[in-house]
Amino acid sequence: MPRARIEGIVLDAMGVLYAHGDDVGELLIPYLRGKGCKLSDRDIEHLYRECSLGRLTTDEFWIEACGPGAYDEDYCRSHRLTDGVIPLLAELKAAGYRLGCLTNDVGEWSTLLRERFGLTEYVPHWVVSADYGIRKPRPEAYDLICSLLATEPGRVLFVDDRAANVEAARKLGMYALHFGQPGLSTMDELRQTLHERFTPW
């Protein structure tokens, strides 16, 4: 089967670039519990969603969730990159792909993390839900990242660890891969899939 020719590759942040796919359940809620937060998990998830849509600042989020004592830099220390992601990004950049990230995230945290790990050296285009008030899988989010990449959906590959987001991308005409599935759960496996199925335009 001939390889598909693409111009852009768009990666999700949590669960693809970063190791933890459920950052709320795996990182945020435990962090807040350690700070004495008494809210239910459901209430924390609601506050996070509001913050990820740009309706709350992180200062407002921390006050609502647990009062003084929690802050952005402290929380973001718990995140780590997926093993092998930087070498793969460097290879994709060198191959001439236009790289972007489409993520449902809090703006301040997204900025802190990409600066901490030096991701903008490889991924210059970011659509963060809090910055635009739009979360995946809404079609407008995908339209925004394609616009930033200056290419049409049919020339873009989208990689995400959530099935609903992958399906939404496909409905818009994008190529899409569901990361985290058997045979596609490491950067080496993603590299191999990219080599077998895609080539730069």
Language-model-derived ranges and their functions:
Residues 1-9, 90, 106-107, 111-201:
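Asp-based, Mg2+/Mn2+-dependent phosphohydrolase catalytic module
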Residues 2-46, 171-172:
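Active-site neighborhood of HAD-like aspartate-dependent phosphohydrolases
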Residues 12-15, 54, 101, 126, ...:
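Generic structural signal for small/hydrophobic residues in well-ordered secondary structure
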Residues 20-21, 84, 105:
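Acidic donor-diphosphate engagement hotspot in glycosyltransferases and nucleotidyltransferases
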Residues 28-37, 47-50, 72-83:
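Helical cap/lid subdomains and adjacent loops of hydrolase enzymes that gate the active-site channel
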Residues 45-73:
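A metal-dependent, Asp-based hydrolase signature
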Residues 72-100, 139:
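Short, acidic loop-to-helix structural element flanking the phosphoryl-transfer center
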